[in-house]
Amino acid sequence: MTNKDESVEKNTESTVEETNIKQNIDDSVEQAEESKGHLQDEAIEETSDENVIEEIDPKDQKINELQQLADENEEKYLRLYAEFENYKRRIQKENEINKTYQAQRVLTDILPAIDNIERALQIEGDDETFKSLQKGVQMVHESLINALKDNGLEVIKTEGEAFDPNIHQAVVQDDNPDFESGEITQELQKGYKLKDRVLRPSMVKVNQ
């Protein structure tokens, strides 16, 4: 190869190298410009957000405060309303209980009078005047018992029933083959309940 050819080859290589270097520089400049642009955009966005935060309308702030106050008052109202409803239910329940048993003392005081009327009805007589009087007493007794039953009074069942210490009072033991052991063979005095509460237990004779 001649000196001329070598010179041409070197010039060509230099030109290619310069071109590559220039291209790299251009690429770097372009990337730098893009990065700068992104940074500027981000800075503008941050500045814009700060301005939005700083420039809250006083009216909007007042509305937010009023809304918060309204929410707090609503919560207080709901809590008070729930407490009031619970109070009403409790009072209503107490009133129902009092109403159910308000006649208990009066009925208890009436029971001895009923016993006396029933004893009088057991007396026998042939006189027409006596029979007429007894019939009148019987009508009064029936009316009284029906009125008391309408108010919750209930006669406790006895004869033939199994003895229950909760509603029966055993006075005498019996030995009757017609009844099972523990069954009531005879009622000595009537017992009464007011709904589910015993006013007076029945006095009974219980089979052994």
Swiss-Prot record:
Cellular component terms, GO, for this chain's entry? cytoplasm
What GO annotations for molecular function exist for this entry?
adenyl-nucleotide exchange factor activity; protein homodimerization activity; protein-folding chaperone binding; unfolded protein binding
Organism equals: Staphylococcus aureus (strain JH9)
Tell me which HAMAP family the record gives.
Answer: GrpE
Region Disordered, residue ranges: 1-59
SUPFAM superfamilies per record:
Coiled-coil domain of nucleotide exchange factor GrpE, Head domain of nucleotide exchange factor GrpE
Bias regions of kind Acidic residues — which residues?
A: 42-55
Q: What is its main location?
A: cytoplasm
What is the protein name given in its UniProt record?
Protein GrpE
**Which locations, inside or outside the cell, does it occupy?**
Cytoplasm
- Mark out the compositionally biased spans (Basic and acidic residues): 1-12
Regions of biased composition (Polar residues) lie at: 13-23
Gene Ontology terms: biological process: protein folding
